[in-house]
Amino acid sequence: VGDSVLLPRSIWTGYDMDFLCRQLQRDPATFKDSLRIKPVKDAIGTRRYCSSIYDWTSGFFPGNLWYAYQLTGIEGLKNGAVKFTNYLYPVKDYKGTHDIGFMMNCSYGNAYRLAPADSVRQALVQTADNLCSRFDPTIGSIRSWDFGKWNFPVIIDNMMNLDLLFYVSHLTNDSKYKDIALKHAETTLKNHFRTDHSSYHVVSYNNDGSVEMKCTHQGKNDDSSWARGQAWGVYGYTSCYRESKDTAFLQQAKDIATLIMTRVKTEDAIPLWDYDAPDSPETPRDASAASVTASALIELSTLVEDGQVYFDYAEKLLKSLSSDAYLAKVGTNQGFILMHSTGSLPN
């Protein structure tokens, strides 16, 4: 969040920064193999946080290290961030998914923000160009996937990749990146959302721009409200309003936030993996959805006059995530920070 030094450090309420640093630095060499182009197969007793550098989550660990370095100034964290960011360098040439947006923005985007270098900037611009190559002007969207039964699939997650285009538009003073991002957001706003402001996961388009189908790939069913999908939506439209000041995007962000806050079934506000999943002790929760939502709502709270309600809800989420129920102990949880996330339950 811009001017974040002015915000209360709610994440420190019940949150142990020393733990965060120790957990992130705990034997990170065991993550190295994850960031090879072709990692070795899983072995019992080893950990991998993604399947390869081309996995959609590959930029998250480097991004964690960059943020931890920003918060603490610990040089060891910076050195780790640089090393794990550099592993992703081949991704700048990859065009096979929309996820190159936050794969590279989480890693190289934070690298340029905190340790700028010409090679880092070049990698970001090249990645943004590759992401733009997936944009179809007739459809008005960036294609998400190159697999599956769909003609031109666009998933709500794609809203998270737009920040790379906004960032590179600022870096280059070239509006084409921003223009594509905003057109994608407009098309998604038109076709992804139901009357209650919940989102479909997948909308696929025909070549003429008409909708082929609306369905899910990771939610409970085609008409359900997948928790992380709603988090992607509120985060993405908050970013789009920040960059455009288009009030339609702001209203959408607020509407999704209201949906999330009113439909959550759990006392601690950490959502079940799908808002339409049965409310039972056996139903998995999704701490990752809560984390994305908290980040979005903190920023949203700074963009509106009535922002306290969003900040308070984000703080509630962060307090829950910082509790023993979700925050792992050092040396546990295979080195990961949070417990009880749900990746893709139907798959």
Language-model segments: what does each one mean?
Residues V1-N347:
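Glycan-recognition and catalytic cores of secretory/periplasmic carbohydrate-active enzymes
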